[in-house]
Amino acid sequence: MRLEIQRRFSDLDPLGHVNNVAYHDYLQEARMGLISDLDAVVNDDYAMVVVSQEIRHVKPLEYSRKPVVIETRVTDMARTSYSIVYRVLDEKGDIAAEATTRLAVVDPVSGRPIRMP
């Protein structure tokens, strides 16, 4: 899946680069878009929680009116968890960052891992 996200002035650090914290927001938007497209949003039977997230910054993103493109795909599916991998692309299509998020499916009451639906 590909999602375009507009950079905000508030995303910038004093050097004019997109701050590393903003990448987490971008990844969350892309993750929720992917989960929604897969019709796997949270319901009363299960919830998805982030277990880990790793971002490798390749090159700085600077402010631009053109959106950042986030490419996402699901990988590494297990019984109670899965990973989403991302590529963050600048306005030229160059890779600015690569990331992975590991999510677990849990019972919303107990918080314990459960088998994926």
Language-model segments: which ranges?
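Intrinsically disordered, low-complexity segments enriched in small/polar residues
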Residues: 21-24, 55, 80, 84
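HotDog/MaoC-like acyl-thioester-processing domains
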Residues: 1-3, 62-64, 75-117
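Hot-dog-fold acyl-thioester-processing enzymes
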Residues: 1-52, 108-117
